[in-house]
Amino acid sequence: MAAIYLDSSAIVKLAVREPESDALRRYLRTRHPRVSSALARAEVMRALLDKGESARKAGRRALAHLDLLRVDKRVLDLAGGLLPFELRTLDAIHLATAQRLGVDLGRLCTYDDRMRDAAKTLGMAVIAPS
């Protein structure tokens, strides 16, 4: 089955109640595997720093239910060449990680507009359940 790649904006919605959280949970309920970059471990926890211990605990649980893919030299080299120029470095690493999945990538789940636009430019199927 094709993987669902979650970027950090989606993972945070699994840890903290936001308007899209329930729709995202429903969407993911029967979809496996769920993957992200190992980068998400730091990115998500930093996003939850000011949300309290229960949010951080929920963030750790959400991350534990994902297959976190290594950020290796090939991912970094690929990320370094991704366009558009305005693409932020961490987003480029997420996109490069997703791109490395090749045919095993089903959809990329993001709630970040710049990430969505860049992923579509790369030919990825993008979702944001709401």
Swiss-Prot record:
Residues 4-118 form the PINc domain. One of its GO terms (biological process) is negative regulation of growth. GO terms for molecular function: magnesium ion binding; RNA nuclease activity. Its cofactor is Mg(2+). Coiled coil: none annotated. Its EC number is 3.1.-.-. InterPro entries: PIN-like_dom_sf, PIN_dom, VapC_family. It comes from the Bacteria. The keyword Nucleus does not apply. Pfam families: PIN (PF01850). The keyword Coiled coil does not apply. Keywords: Hydrolase, Magnesium, Metal-binding, Nuclease, Toxin-antitoxin system. Mg(2+) binds at residues 7, 91. One of its GO terms (cellular component) is plasma membrane. Toxic component of a type II toxin-antitoxin (TA) system. An RNase. Upon expression in M.smegmatis inhibits colony formation. Its toxic effect is neutralized by coexpression with cognate antitoxin VapB46. Belongs to the PINc/VapC protein family. HAMAP family: VapC_Nob1. This is Ribonuclease VapC46.
